[in-house]
C-alpha cells in the first residue's frame, strides 16, 4: 500500500502509495493505486543508514520453501474466494433492489467518499462468519475501516442494508464499538454512513441491555465529542429507534431525500401506539428534519450529493497531525515481501529464523538489534517502516526467562523514548518444567506481561504463526489493547494446541481411572482425544477467531509492510508522549 516517502523542505513527509495498478477497498492481497498520499506533518531527517542490514537470503529452490508457499497460497486462495462472497453483502437480489431505489451499495459509498486512488484499510471482513447458523451476516452487516478524505485519515462505519436490513446482530455491535475504539485511541474523525433498521429484535437480549451492547455506541459518541474527535453522520437509509441518536449526537448530519429517515418510533409503532397513520417520509424524512426539527444540518437529493457534502464537511475540520517522532526518507526492503508466504513453515511446530521476515518488512532491511546474544528466542530491535521509527519484538522460539526479561527491558526503552512497538507473534508459550519453575520463569514472564500492559506507546500486533497460552499475553494479544491486531491466513490462536489439550485431558482421565484400578486401551484414548483436538483446531482457526472480531483483519503476508505502515500512520494522529514521571528504565 505504501511505497515511497518524499522529503520536503517544509519538513512534511508524504507517504506515497505506489503499488503497481488498480485499487481496493479491503486489506487482503489486492493492489492499490499510485495516487494516494498520507500526509504526516512531522520533523524529518535523512534516512538513517547506521543500522545493520539483515541477511534475508533464503533458498527458494528448497523443498521446504516450496511446500510452505504451496500451503500458504492454497489457504490464501480459499480466503480470497470467501471474501469475494462476503463483498456481495446480502446477495444479488437485494443489491439490485437497493440500486433500483437509487441507492449506492455500501462499498460504492465508501469508494466515492475516500480520496481517489487512496487505500481503505478495512477491518474484520470475516466478522460474523458462520456464527448464526443458516443466517449469513456478511462482514457482520457493517463495513468499518480507515480511509482518507481530503488527506484526513478517518474511521468509516457504514451499515449494509442488504444484510438483514442493516440490523444490529451481536457481532455488528461488537464491530461498531471496535471501530469507535480505534477512532478514540488514534484521535481519528469518525464518519457514520447510516442505513440500518436498528437492533435485531429476535436477538435483543444479546444486543440491547449490557454494558458493551447497542447503547454503548452513543456513550462512545458523547465521550468522543468531549475529546474533540469529530463525528459526522450521513443518513442514507433507515435510522430507527435508538439509532436515531447517531445523527442527533454527531457534530454535523446529512440526510438523503426519499431514502433517509430518522425516527425513534417508525410508522407501525406510531399507528399501534397512537392510531396515527403517517408515512416514513412524513414522520422522519429529509424535509422534516432539515426544515422543521433541525435534527439534520444538510439536505442531499441523492447519495452522490450526500457524499460530496460529507467530503466538504471533512475539508472544514481544520485538522492536522501533531508533532511526533523524527520521520526519515523511506527505503524499500532489500528482499521482496512476496517471499514472506514461503518463509513461515506450514507446520507451526517447526522453528525458522524470524529475521528473514523482519528483513522483508523494514526499510532497507536495516535492523539495530538489542541484546543480540542474550535471550535469543526473542528478537528485539529498532527499525523504520516507511520512515517511521518502530521497536520490533519478534518470537524466534519458545520464551525462556532470559527472553522475557530482555523483552521487558526493550519495551521499557521504547516506552521511555516514545517509539511505537510492533509485535510479530509466533509463540507456543513460556517454557515449562521443574528446572524453569525453580528459576522463576513465572515472575520473569510476569515482568514482560507487566511491561506490555503498561506501555503507553502505540502497539501493533501481527500474528504470523501460532499464538498460544501465556505467550499470547506477553506478545501483546488482544487483552493487552494493541492499537491494531492482524493475523496471517495460517495463524492459529488458542490457550494451547489441540494435540496438547487432548493429551492433558486424556492424562487427567487416565489418572482418575487408575485410582479406580481401571485401564484405558490405546483405541479408547484416541477416541477420547480426537473430538477435543478437532474442537481446538476449529476454534483456533482464523475463520473462528476473526468471525468474533478477536483481530482487526486477516491479511495477505505480502501486504504486511503496507498494513503496518498504514496502521502506524493512523497512530500518529494521537501525540506520542513518553512518560513524564514515575520510574525510569529498570535493567532486567
From Swiss-Prot:
Subcellular location per the Swiss-Prot or TrEMBL entry: Mitochondrion matrix
State the residue spans of region: Carboxyltransferase. Answer: 72-570
One GO biological-process annotation of the entry reads:
L-leucine catabolic process
Q: Which GO terms describe its molecular function?
A: ATP binding; methylcrotonoyl-CoA carboxylase activity
Predominant localisation class: mitochondrion
Enzyme Commission code(s) on record: 6.4.1.4
Functional pathway = Amino-acid degradation; L-leucine degradation; (S)-3-hydroxy-3-methylglutaryl-CoA from 3-isovaleryl-CoA: step 2/3
**Which reaction(s) does the protein catalyse, per the Swiss-Prot or TrEMBL entry?**
3-methylbut-2-enoyl-CoA + hydrogencarbonate + ATP = 3-methyl-(2E)-glutaconyl-CoA + ADP + phosphate + H(+)
| Keyword set, alphabetical order | ATP-binding, Ligase, Mitochondrion, Nucleotide-binding, Transit peptide
Q: Mind naming one GO cellular-component term on file for this protein?
A: mitochondrion
Q: Does the keyword ATP-binding apply?
A: yes
Record flagged with keyword Protease: no
What is the top-level taxon of the source organism?
A: Eukaryota
From the UniProt entry, list the residue stretches annotated as the region Acyl-CoA binding: 366-395
Every copy of the CoA carboxyltransferase C-terminal domain together lies at 329-570
What residues does the CoA carboxyltransferase N-terminal domain cover?
72-329
In terms of InterPro entries, this protein maps to: AcCoA_carboxyl_beta, ClpP/crotonase-like_dom_sf, COA_CT_C, COA_CT_N, MCCB/AccD1-like
Outline the subunit composition: Probably a dodecamer composed of six biotin-containing alpha subunits and six beta subunits.
Q: Which family does it belong to?
A: Belongs to the AccD/PCCB family.
Cited PANTHER family: ACETYL, PROPIONYL, PYRUVATE, AND GLUTACONYL CARBOXYLASE-RELATED, METHYLCROTONOYL-COA CARBOXYLASE BETA CHAIN, MITOCHONDRIAL
What the protein does? Carboxyltransferase subunit of the 3-methylcrotonyl-CoA carboxylase, an enzyme that catalyzes the conversion of 3-methylcrotonyl-CoA to 3-methylglutaconyl-CoA, a critical step for leucine and isovaleric acid catabolism.
Q: What is this protein called?
A: Methylcrotonoyl-CoA carboxylase beta chain, mitochondrial
**Organism of provenance:** Dictyostelium discoideum (Social amoeba)
The taxonomy runs: Eukaryota, Amoebozoa, Evosea, Eumycetozoa, Dictyostelia
The gene it comes from is: mccb
Amino acid at each position: 500500500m505504501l511505497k515511497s516517502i518524499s522529503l520536503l523542505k517544509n519538513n512534511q513527509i508524504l507517504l506515497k502509495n505506489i503499488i503497481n495498478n488498480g485499487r481496493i477497498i479491503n486489506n487482503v492481497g489486492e493492489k492499490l493505486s499510485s495516487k494516494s498520499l498520507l500526509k504526516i506533518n512531522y520533523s524529518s531527517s535523512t534516512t538513517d543508514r547506521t543500522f545493520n542490514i539483515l541477511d534475508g537470503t533464503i533458498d527458494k529452490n528448497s523443498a521446504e520453501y516450496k511446500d510452505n508457499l504451496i500451503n500458504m497460497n492454497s489457504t490464501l486462495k480459499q480466503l480470497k474466494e470467501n471474501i469475494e462472497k462476503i463483498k456481495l453483502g446480502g446477495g444479488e437480489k437485494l443489491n439490485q433492489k437497493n440500486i433500483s431505489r437509487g441507492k449506492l451499495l455500501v462499498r460504492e459509498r465508501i469508494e466515492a467518499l475516500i480520496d481517489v486512488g487512496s487505500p481503505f484499510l478495512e477491518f474484520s471482513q470475516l466478522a460474523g462468519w458462520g456464527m448464526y447458523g443458516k443466517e449469513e451476516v456478511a462482514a457482520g452487516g457493517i463495513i468499518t475501516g480507515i480511509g482518507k478524505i481530503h488527506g484526513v485519515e478517518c474511521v468509516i462505519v457504514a451499515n449494509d442494508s442488504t444484510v438483514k436490513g442493516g440490523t444490529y446482530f451481536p457481532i455488528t455491535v461488537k464491530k461498531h464499538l471496535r471501530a469507535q475504539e480505534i477512532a478514540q485511541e488514534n484521535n481519528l474523525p469518525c464518519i457514520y454512513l447510516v442505513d440500518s433498521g436498528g437492533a435485531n429484535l429476535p436477538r435483543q437480549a444479546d444486543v440491547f441491555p449490557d454494558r458493551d451492547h447497542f447503547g454503548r455506541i452513543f456513550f462512545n459518541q458523547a465521550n468522543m465529542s468531549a475529546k474533540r474527535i469529530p463525528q459526522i453522520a450521513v443518513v442514507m437509509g433507515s435510522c430507527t429507534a435508538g439509532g436515531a441518536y447517531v445523527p442527533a449526537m454527531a457534530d454535523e448530519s446529512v440526510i438523503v431525500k426519499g431514502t433517509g429517515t430518522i425516527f425513534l418510533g417508525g410508522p407501525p409503532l406510531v399507528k399501534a401506539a397512537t392510531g396515527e397513520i403517517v408515512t416514513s417520509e412524513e414522520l422522519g424524512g429529509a424535509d422534516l428534519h432539515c426544515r422543521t426539527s433541525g435534527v439534520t444540518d444538510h439536505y442531499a437529493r441523492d447519495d452522490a450529493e450526500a457524499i460530496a457534502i460529507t467530503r466538504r464537511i471533512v475539508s472544514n475540520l481544520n485538522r492536522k497531525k501533531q508533532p511526533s517522532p523524527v520521520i526519515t526518507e523511506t527505503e524499500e526492503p532489500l528482499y521482496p515481501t512476496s517471499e514472506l508466504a514461503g518463509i513461515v513453515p506450514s507446520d507451526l511446530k517447526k522453528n525458522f529464523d524470524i529475521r528473514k521476515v523482519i528483513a522483508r518488512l523494514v526499510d532497507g532491511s536495516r535492523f539495530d538489534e538489542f541484546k543480540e546474544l542474550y535471550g535469543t528466542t526473542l528478537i528485539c530491535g529498532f527499525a523504520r517502516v516507511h520512515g517511521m521509527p518502530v521497536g520490533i519484538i519478534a518470537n524466534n522460539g519458545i520464551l525462556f526467562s532470559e527472553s522475557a526479561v530482555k523483552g521487558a527491558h526493550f519495551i521499557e526503552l521504547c516506552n521511555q523514548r516514545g517509539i511505537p512497538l510492533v509485535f510479530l507473534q509466533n509463540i507456543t508459550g513460556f517454557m515449562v518444567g521443574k528446572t524453569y519453575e525453580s528459576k522463576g520463569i513465572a515472575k520473569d514472564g510476569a515482568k514482560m506481561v507487566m511491561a506490555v500492559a503498561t506501555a503507553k506507546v502505540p502497539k501493533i500486533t501481527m500474528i504470523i504463526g501460532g499464538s498460544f497460552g501465556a505467550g499470547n499475553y506477553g506478545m501483546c494479544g488482544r487483552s493487552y489493547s494493541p492499537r491494531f491486531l492482524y493475523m496471517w491466513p495460517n495463524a492459529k490462536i488458542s490457550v494451547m494446541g489441540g494435540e496438547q489439550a487432548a493429551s492433558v485431558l486424556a492424562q487427567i482421565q487416565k489418572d482418575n481411572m487408575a485410582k479406580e484400578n481401571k485401564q484405558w486401551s490405546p483405541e479408547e484414548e484416541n477416541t477420547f482425544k480426537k473430538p477435543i483436538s478437532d474442537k481446538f483446531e476449529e476454534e483456533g482457526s482464523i475463520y473462528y477467531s476473526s468471525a468474533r472480531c478477536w483481530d482487526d483483519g486477516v491479511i495477505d503476508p505480502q501486504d504486511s509492510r503496507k498494513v503496518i505502515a498504514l496502521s502506524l500512520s493512523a497512530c500518529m494522529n494521537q501525540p506520542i508522549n513518553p512518560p513524564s514521571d514515575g520510574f525510569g528504565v529498570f535493567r532486567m
